[in-house]
């Protein structure tokens, strides 16, 4: 065994988020949501994700924040559960970046309408308000956001979290609902000025509404000029994978080569993509060990492993070997970046020998190990 005289930098520069289901955590471990037992189990998951170098977390605003409405219709917000969640993840080393969950949703892929989320709201008589979910550009939703967003930003500022917060608007907008998305973005700009927006999208029609683009690599490949132009304007470009892309593109499905989830993060380095997002840490249905092809959207199944990359164990999550490979790739990214500080051309040559393009990369373990050995040799010489 040869031990290298190299230390990973303490700063984690690559933004990594695997969205996780708190409901599944509670269900699989037999605890009630928001009970003390739940918080203990969630802490185990948070530390686990941090160990695997995740440093951003989707924060479910309308599960964590509740509201009270006075007789005049004015809302006050209770952030105590939100604070406990963020503080726990912060202490665990997971946050990092706070991803505010989506403010709106769509009922159909190509609908023109986006509808706004609302929190659980208590009325003066102690009953819960029965919200009617309305379109994002309606006067009712505007009135809600005019109260909610300033209160949220004020609270983030008071807690010292303002600069680490980014806001999702609606997941994967397409041309059909771009107008509604842009209207929602305009309200976020108005009521939460300076808050960066982020979403998984490849839709040109929402340009100007997105600060952090998160497209699939295949879409960047087909629209390189567009995404380069957005970066020149100061916007960030991350990448995400889900049930797509397939074919020659890297992904982290069970039946893909184990180098594939690792090399995703060599691709991060090669093209300067600042982050990586995946929707499915633990969104399995039924037996996580047997049901690996989640039936969604019906009647089609998701590719094997898309819905979850960890498994529920008796005392906490069990990593898959794909998750181990992903963590190794994130560490490789930091090593490449470390070498690039002193020998940029050398780091790029090593990376290019492994990932030649988004669809041309080595799956030969021997070739990969030799390239990584060259990386470690160069780092030892440089430091």
Feature map (PLM): residue ranges:
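Catalytic-core region of carbohydrate-active enzymes that cleave or remodel glycosidic bonds
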Residues: 88-89, 212-302
């Amino acid at each position: 065994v040869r031990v290298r005289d190299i230390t990973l930098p303490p700063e984690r520069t690559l933004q990594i988020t695997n969205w996780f289901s708190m409901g599944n955590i509670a269900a699989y471990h037999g605890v009630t949501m928001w009970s003390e037992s739940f918080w203990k189990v969630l802490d185990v998951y948070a530390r686990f994700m941090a160990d695997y170098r995740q440093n951003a977390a989707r924060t479910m605003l309308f599960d964590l924040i509740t509201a009270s409405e006075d007789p005049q219709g004015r809302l006050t917000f209770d952030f105590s559960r939100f604070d406990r969640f963020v503080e726990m993840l912060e202490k665990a080393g997971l946050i990092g970046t706070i991803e505010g969950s989506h403010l709106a949703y769509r009922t159909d892929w190509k609908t023109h309408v986006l509808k706004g989320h609302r929190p659980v709201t208590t009325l003066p008589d102690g009953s819960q308000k029965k919200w009617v979910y309305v379109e994002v550009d309606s006067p009712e939703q505007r009135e809600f956001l005019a109260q909610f967003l300033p209160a949220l930003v004020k609270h983030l500022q008071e807690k010292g979290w303002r600069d680490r917060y980014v806001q999702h608007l609606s997941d994967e907008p397409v041309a059909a609902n771009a107008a509604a998305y842009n209207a929602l973005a305009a309200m976020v700009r108005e009521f939460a000025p300076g808050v960066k927006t982020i979403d998984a999208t490849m839709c040109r029609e929402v340009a100007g509404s997105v600060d952090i683009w998160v497209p699939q690599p295949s879409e960047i490949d087909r629209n390189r000029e567009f995404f380069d132009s957005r970066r020149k304007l100061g916007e960030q470009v991350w990448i995400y994978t889900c049930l797509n892309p397939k074919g020659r593109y890297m992904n982290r499905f069970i039946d893909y080569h184990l180098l594939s989830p690792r090399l995703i993060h060599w691709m991060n380095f090669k093209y300067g993509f600042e982050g990586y997002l995946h929707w499915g840490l633990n969104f399995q249905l039924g037996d996580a060990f047997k049901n690996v092809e989640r039936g969604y959207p019906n009647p089609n199944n998701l590719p094997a492993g898309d819905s979850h990359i960890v498994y529920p164990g008796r005392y906490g999550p069990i990593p898959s070997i794909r998750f181990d490979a992903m963590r190794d790739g994130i560490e490789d990214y930091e090593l490449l970046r470390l070498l690039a500080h002193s020998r940029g051309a050398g780091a790029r040559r090593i990376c290019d020998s492994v990932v030649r393009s988004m669809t041309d990369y080595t799956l030969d373990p021997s070739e990969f190990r030799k390239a990584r050995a060259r990386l470690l040799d160069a780092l030892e010489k440089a430091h």
